[in-house]
Amino acid sequence: MGGHEGFSNQRLSSATWFSHFRASALRSKSLPPPSSQTAVRSTSGDSLVRRLGLFDLILLGVGASIGAGVFVVTGTVARDAGPGVTISFLLAGASCVLNALCYAELSSRFPAVVGGAYMYSYSAFNEITAFLVFVQLMLDYHIGAASISRSLASYAVALLELFPALKGSIPLWMGSGKELLGGLLSLNILAPILLALLTLVLCQGVRESSAVNSVMTATKVVIVLVVICAGAFEIDVANWSPFAPNGFKAVLTGATVVFFSYVGFDAVANSAEESKNPQRDLPIGIMGSLLVCISLYIGVCLVLTGMVPFSLLSEDAPLAEAFSSKGMKFVSILISIGAVAGLTTTLLVGLYVQSRLYLGLGRDGLLPSIFSRIHPTLHTPLHSQIWCGIVAGVLAGIFNVHSLSHILSVGTLTGYSVVAACVVALRLNDKKDRESSNRWTSSWQEGVICLVIIACSGFGAGVFYRFSASVIFILLSVGVAVVASAVLHYRQAYALPLGSGFSCPGVPIVPSVCIFFNIFLFAQLHYEAWIRFVVVSVLATAVYALYGQYHADPSMLDYQRAPETESDA
C-alpha cells in the first residue's frame, strides 16, 4: 500500500473529513478518445492475455445462463401459467434483450478493461456508486456460488446413485448436507471439493477454463436439443388448450419468475480484457448468447406443455417425469447429465466473473492491492480467484445457503438497472463534454433526476401489483414513468458514443424501460431482500468511508485501455 501512503497521510490536511468523503465519493473515471492504447498492468507488472474468440464468448454467456433450471423452472412455472409459460419466457427474454442492448453498448465503449457494471458506473456516475454496485453484486455471486455448488453436489450424488451398487450408500454430508446444531449448520464435503476443482481449473489460465466451459456447455446444449427433438414426436396439440388457463396475470407473474433464468449474459462483459477483438466480439457475444438461451427455453416449454397436460406436471422433476411417463427413461438420464453440466458451467463462469471484479477494484485501490496481482506465467488473477473459491467453499461447506436464496437477485437487478442508467448518463456526458467542461450541468442533473423518478415509479408499480392494489395505482405509476421518459427524450440531447462500436438503439426509451421493469421485478422479491439491499448499502458505505476513500488510487481515474491484440506472453 506504500504507493498510497503519501496520499493517505494528507487526507485531512486540506479539508474536513466530510468534505474529503464527498470529494472522494463523487469523483469518477474519465473516458479518453478511442485512440488511447495505454496498457493496463497489475501491481506485479503483468496483464491478462487476449485468448477468447467470439465462439468462446457466446459459450461463456450460454454457460452462465443455462443451468439445471431449464429442466425444472419451466415445469414449475407451467403449473400456474399453463402452456402460456412460453409467453412468460418470451416476455422475460424480450426484457433481457433490452438489458443486453445496454450491456452491448457499454462493453463496446469499454472494450479493454475488466469490471463490467462496476467500471461502467464508475465512469458514468461516481466512485461510491460503483463501490455499492460491486458489493451488491458480489454478495449475490458469493451466496449464489455456494448455493449452486450444493445443488451440483446433490445432482452429482443423484447421478452416481443411478448405479445400483451406489444407490442409498452415499452419506448425506456428501450430497444434500448433514444438519448440525438444530439446523444452524449444515455440513457438506462434496460442494467445497467441487469448488476447489473448478477454482484450480480457473487458476490455470483463461484458455484452459474456456476449454472446460466450452465442452460442458456444448454437452448441455446438445442434451437440451435432444430433449426438444425427442419430445417433439410426443406432442399432443390438445394439451396447449387452453393456452393461458389462469389468465394473463399468471403469465406475467411467470415472466417475473423466469426472468432470472436468463441472468448470465452479462458475464461476457467481464471478459473484456481477455477477448481477442473486444469492441466487435463483446456485443455479439452478449446478444448471441442471450438469443441462444431464449430459443432453447422456448423450445423446452413447447415440448413440455405439449407432452403432458400442465395440471399433471411434477413439481420436482417435471421434464424427467414427463419423458418417463412416455417410456423414454433414457432421456431422464440425459437430463440428469445435462443438469450436472449446466450447474458446472454456471458455477465456473460465476467464479470467473467474481475474480475479474475483484481485480478491477484491486487496481483502483478500493480493495487491498493483493487482489490486483496477476500471475506472471498463468496470466490469471490468482489471489482473487483463490479468494473467491475460499469464500464460496466455506459458505457451501458449513451453511445451508439454500435458505438464503430468497434474498438473492438484488445485486443482479441493481446491476442491470445501473447499467441501463449508465447508457443515458454517458450519452449525456458525451454531449456535455463537447459543449462544456462543467460535469454537473443542470441538464445532466435533470437527466439523473428523471432516471430516479423512473426507478421509483417501477418500484411503486411493482408493489401495487404484488399486493393486488387497484389497477388505477399501477397505471398512475406507469404514467409518471412515461412522463419522466418523455422529459428525457424531448428535453435532453444525446451524443452517439465516440468510435465505431455498437450503439444501443432507442436511447433514452430503451434504458428507461429496462430500469422500470428491473425495479418492478425488484419489488416482487421477498421483503427480506429489500432489507438486505438497505443494510448492505449502509455497511458498504461505512467500509468505503473507513477504507475506500483513503486508499483509492487517484492515478487510476484516467481510464486506461489494455492492448487490443492477442498476447501469448
Swiss-Prot record:
<feature type="transmembrane region" description="Helical">
    <location>
        <begin position="502"/>
        <end position="522"/>
    </location>
</feature>
<feature type="transmembrane region" description="Helical">
    <location>
        <begin position="181"/>
        <end position="201"/>
    </location>
</feature>
<keyword id="KW-0813">Transport</keyword>
<feature type="transmembrane region" description="Helical">
    <location>
        <begin position="444"/>
        <end position="464"/>
    </location>
</feature>
<dbReference type="InterPro" id="IPR029485">
    <property type="entry name" value="CAT_C"/>
</dbReference>
<feature type="transmembrane region" description="Helical">
    <location>
        <begin position="53"/>
        <end position="73"/>
    </location>
</feature>
<feature type="transmembrane region" description="Helical">
    <location>
        <begin position="81"/>
        <end position="101"/>
    </location>
</feature>
<feature type="transmembrane region" description="Helical">
    <location>
        <begin position="528"/>
        <end position="548"/>
    </location>
</feature>
<dbReference type="InterPro" id="IPR002293">
    <property type="entry name" value="AA/rel_permease1"/>
</dbReference>
<feature type="transmembrane region" description="Helical">
    <location>
        <begin position="284"/>
        <end position="304"/>
    </location>
</feature>
<dbReference type="Pfam" id="PF13520">
    <property type="entry name" value="AA_permease_2"/>
</dbReference>
<keyword id="KW-0812">Transmembrane</keyword>
<keyword id="KW-0150">Chloroplast</keyword>
<feature type="transmembrane region" description="Helical">
    <location>
        <begin position="333"/>
        <end position="353"/>
    </location>
</feature>
<feature type="transmembrane region" description="Helical">
    <location>
        <begin position="113"/>
        <end position="135"/>
    </location>
</feature>
<dbReference type="GO" id="GO:0022857">
    <property type="term" value="F:transmembrane transporter activity"/>
</dbReference>
<keyword id="KW-0029">Amino-acid transport</keyword>
<comment type="similarity">
    <text>Belongs to the amino acid-polyamine-organocation (APC) superfamily. Cationic amino acid transporter (CAT) (TC 2.A.3.3) family.</text>
</comment>
<feature type="transmembrane region" description="Helical">
    <location>
        <begin position="467"/>
        <end position="487"/>
    </location>
</feature>
<dbReference type="GO" id="GO:0031969">
    <property type="term" value="C:chloroplast membrane"/>
</dbReference>
<feature type="transmembrane region" description="Helical">
    <location>
        <begin position="155"/>
        <end position="175"/>
    </location>
</feature>
<dbReference type="Pfam" id="PF13906">
    <property type="entry name" value="AA_permease_C"/>
</dbReference>
<keyword id="KW-1133">Transmembrane helix</keyword>
<keyword id="KW-0472">Membrane</keyword>
<keyword id="KW-0934">Plastid</keyword>
<comment type="function">
    <text>Permease involved in the transport of the cationic amino acids.</text>
</comment>
<dbReference type="GO" id="GO:0006865">
    <property type="term" value="P:amino acid transport"/>
</dbReference>
<keyword id="KW-0809">Transit peptide</keyword>
<dbReference type="GO" id="GO:0000325">
    <property type="term" value="C:plant-type vacuole"/>
</dbReference>
<feature type="transmembrane region" description="Helical">
    <location>
        <begin position="215"/>
        <end position="235"/>
    </location>
</feature>
<feature type="transit peptide" description="Chloroplast">
    <location>
        <begin position="1"/>
        <end position="41"/>
    </location>
</feature>
<feature type="transmembrane region" description="Helical">
    <location>
        <begin position="250"/>
        <end position="270"/>
    </location>
</feature>
<feature type="transmembrane region" description="Helical">
    <location>
        <begin position="406"/>
        <end position="428"/>
    </location>
</feature>
<protein>
    <recommendedName>
        <fullName>Cationic amino acid transporter 9, chloroplastic</fullName>
    </recommendedName>
</protein>
